[in-house]
Amino acid sequence: AFKAVLDGLPFQVNEFSLANYILMKDRDIASMMAIPVFLNRAFRHGSLYVRKDGDLSHPRQLKGKMIGAREYTQTAGVWWRGLMIDEYDLHWRDINWVSEKKQRFAPPAEAGVEALDEDLEQLVIDGEIDAILAPSTNDGKKPKDVQMLRPLFPDTEAAERDYFARTGIYPLNHAVVIHNETLAKFPNAPKLLFDAYCASKKQFYAEGSNLNPWGDETDLDLIPFGLTDKNREIVRTLMRYLHEQLFISNLPDIDGLFVDGVADWVDV
């Protein structure tokens, strides 16, 4: 689905990387507008994988290490690097970055990213690099007794819970985007789609499903749609990270990222 957006192929409505969307808006190459429906959220404390038999267990140990990122501009990576600065005083400049050769967008020159032909996950397993930054690994699909990798933090859930308790931030990764041609043909589509997604989520909850990241029973909706105060704060945080990591030249106006009128839309 992302490929259609990135390659300029025809589409009407799509789920897309929020970081890449903001980057494209900054460069004036976005042929779409977003609506405040955020379909993917995840904490990123568990997104760095190291060798299971290694001694790395805290961000303070990562200065000067070599870390692989398959896609350097991926939203997950943007969140992780920002989190490391805010929470652990680990700057992305303090890391030696390597990536796959094919990238959605060229990494900032200041990051000094070296593109490699090799499989980055295998390089960690072989001890050639120190860690890989990724939402998940192929190694994690294997039986636990033969897995070679583990998350950096010994207790990822505890780190996530502490962060959420202090900040209230449940990181946004993807948003729904609508192609400009579709917007021109169907001006009512954005609000209709927003209402449909809200109704779908309400039905999901009514059937007893749980969208809490840790599986806790709660009456709170941790994935609200719309430009709520908290969602605005989270988008601002992501924009700040993009700016600090030199992906975008300016901090955009949040409302300008979304179709007109969304400030009044309510997720009920």
Show where each model-derived region lies.
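Conserved hydrophobic residue
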Residues: 11, 129, 247-248
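Secondary-structure end/capping motifs
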Residues: 177, 182-247
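Short helix-initiation/N-cap motifs at beta->coil->alpha
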Residues: 1-4, 57, 93-126, 217, ...
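Short low-complexity, flexible loop/linker segments enriched in glycine and/or proline
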Residues: 29-31, 147-153, 264-268
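Conserved C-terminal helix/tail region of periplasmic/extracytoplasmic solute-binding proteins
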Residues: 172, 247-268
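Short, glycine-/small- and polar/acidic-enriched structural segments
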Residues: 1-93, 97-100, 104
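Short, solvent-exposed beta-strand edge segments and adjacent coil->beta transition regions
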Residues: 64-65, 171-175, 222
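Pocket-lining segment of extracytoplasmic ligand-binding domains
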Residues: 108-205
